[in-house]
């Protein structure tokens, strides 16, 4: 018998393109795939990454500060909030348009500006690992490191990128509001870029200099929503072992035990495919029937 599923879909920031025109094209294609699920009767909650986008925003804000000394530095948490707004804006409108093309004239789509609490003592703050911004050559990376003091690392053989702290999500601050919207059959876009990273100081939520991995945030969200399925979309076709090597092998499916084995072998790059596989293992292991 057909069962309606509650599905959390996580879109990779790299899959959204590197420019605004590219993003407009990408979200239209993504909206069609998401609306296929909605048309089948499933509840869909959308999370998106922001790696390239938050890096570009941060670079622009940094350049402005260097050009005009009266302009203060823009915190990374504020850059994440900016990325939530403009990516959510494009996604929300693309979904709305595609739904109406299919006759869903009264199906509301809403983007929630989402804060996610992290532990200020998370060791990730001492070990930056989350790539943001566009891919650079070695020479470009060396210039950014010297000019702006950024930590730069090679990303899975595809070039160099800036890396920042990526603490694990502890609590989704707006979780109750998200639950209410989903229970009311709204299509919700939330936890953009993993959520705006904040730490709790008394009653005050203070922005943290970090970018939370959207895969871990999606896993936490899916568990809190009691979702049936977590889908993580990427810019590459599939998960692979021996990625980029002569004996590279694409995987059509993967059990939890196999995934744990490959993680132990170091098959997946930190800040890239590793958190995606870890998030899927965590979610699939958290309840019966979860995939």
Regions found by a protein language model. Name each.
Residues 1-50, 56-66, 180-185:
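N-terminal glycine-/serine-/threonine-rich phosphate-binding loop
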Residues 8-10, 43-56, 108-113, 188-191, ...:
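Short beta-strand segments at enzyme active-site cores
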Residues 19-21, 55-60, 121-127, 200-202, ...:
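Short acidic, glycine/serine/threonine-rich loops at helix termini
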Residues 23-28, 60-71, 125-134, 203-210, ...:
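A glycine- and small-aliphatic-rich helix-loop capping segment at beta-alpha/alpha-beta transitions
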Residues 25-32, 75-93, 98-99, 165-182, ...:
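Polyanion-binding loop/helix "lid" in catalytic or ligand-binding cores
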Residues 64-188:
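Ligand-binding beta-strand-loop-alpha-helix segment within the catalytic cores
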Residues 113-120, 193-196, 236-238:
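Glycine-rich beta-alpha junction loops
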Residues 227-245:
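Acidic, metal-binding active-site segment of PIN/NYN-like and related structure-specific nucleases
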């Amino acid at each position: 018998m057909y069962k309606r599923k509650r599905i959390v879909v996580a879109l990779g920031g790299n899959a959204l393109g590197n420019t605004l025109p590219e993003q407009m094209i990408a979200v239209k294609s993504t909206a069609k795939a998401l609306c296929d699920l909605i048309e089948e009767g499933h509840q869909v909650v959308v999370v998106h990454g922001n790696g390239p986008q938050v890096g570009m925003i941060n670079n622009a804000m940094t350049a402005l500060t260097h050009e005009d000394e009266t302009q203060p530095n823009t915190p990374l948490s504020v850059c994440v909030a900016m990325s939530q707004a403009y990516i959510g804006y494009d996604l929300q409108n693309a979904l709305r348009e595609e739904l109406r093309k299919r006759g869903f004239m009264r199906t509301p789509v809403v983007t929630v500006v989402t804060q996610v609490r992290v532990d200020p003592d998370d060791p990730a703050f001492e070990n930056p690992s989350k790539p943001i911004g566009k891919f650079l050559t070695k020479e470009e990376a060396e210039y950014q490191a010297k000019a702006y003091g950024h930590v730069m690392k090679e990303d899975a053989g595809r070039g160099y990128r800036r890396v920042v702290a990526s603490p694990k999500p502890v609590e989704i601050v707006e979780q109750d509001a998200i639950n209410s919207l989903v229970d009311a059959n709204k299509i919700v876009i939330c936890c953009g870029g993993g959520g705006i990273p904040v730490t709790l100081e008394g009653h005050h939520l203070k922005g943290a200099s970090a970018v939370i991995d959207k895969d871990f945030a999606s896993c936490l969200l899916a568990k809190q929503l009691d979702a049936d399925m977590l889908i993580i979309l990427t810019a590459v076709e599939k998960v692979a072992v021996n990625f980029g090597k002569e004996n590279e092998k694409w995987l059509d499916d993967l059990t939890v035990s196999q995934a744990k084995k490959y993680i132990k072998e170091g098959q997946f790059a930190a800040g890239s495919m590793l958190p995606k596989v870890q998030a899927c293992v965590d979610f699939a292991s958290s309840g019966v029937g979860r995939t």
